[in-house]
């Protein structure tokens, strides 16, 4: 279980240090990354298809990535997901394109979607599948 906390901390620290407006898709019950991002003042909200058992201090909206409510993601610089099911990647990419946000995914093991996007190493390997067209959102 310690490995999962390491992953969450790496993802949370990366997002918090590179973005000011983030949305986590598919939070489930693992809120470590979202807490780090929230503590940095950069978390807009978390979403999941089911109401998860997370702390009441995290902003949460129930939403289905296969039919997203775009208003929940408005203003986000980055959409991120930790260990999403591979079938969630195409609608995540579409959402990121629609709202002009980066999309960053941490996959389980060595999974990836198509070519895997741009690889970002923050202590764990992240896949950036979409890059915002807004130059102020660029992560180098």
Locations of regions flagged by a protein language model:
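C-terminal substrate-binding/active-site "lid" region of AdoMet-derived donor-dependent transferases
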Residues: 87-140
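Conserved SAM-binding loop of SAM-dependent methyltransferases across substrates and taxa
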Residues: 29-41
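A short acidic, Gly/Pro-enriched loop at the edge of an enzyme's catalytic core
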Residues: 70-78
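Conserved SAM-binding motif I beta-strand of class I
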Residues: 43-48
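Conserved SAM-binding strand-loop segment of SAM-dependent methyltransferases
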Residues: 56-68
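S-adenosyl-L-methionine
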Residues: 1-19
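Conserved class I S-adenosyl-L-methionine
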Residues: 18-29
């Amino acid at each position: 279980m310690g490995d999962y906390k390491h992953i969450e901390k790496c993802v949370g620290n990366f997002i918090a240090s590179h973005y000011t407006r983030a949305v986590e898709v598919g939070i489930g019950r693992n809120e470590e990354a979202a807490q780090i991002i929230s503590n940095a003042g950069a978390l807009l909200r978390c979403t999941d298809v089911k109401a998860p058992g997370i702390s009441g201090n995290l902003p949460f909206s129930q939403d289905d990535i296969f039919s997203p409510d775009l208003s929940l993601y408005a203003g986000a610089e980055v959409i991120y997901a930790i260990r999403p099911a591979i079938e969630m990647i195409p609608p995540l990419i579409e959402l990121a394109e629609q709202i002009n946000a980066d999309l960053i995914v941490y996959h389980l093991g060595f999974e990836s979607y198509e070519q895997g996007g741009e690889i970002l190493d923050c202590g764990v390997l992240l896949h950036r599948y979409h890059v915002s067209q807004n130059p102020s959102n660029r992560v180098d």
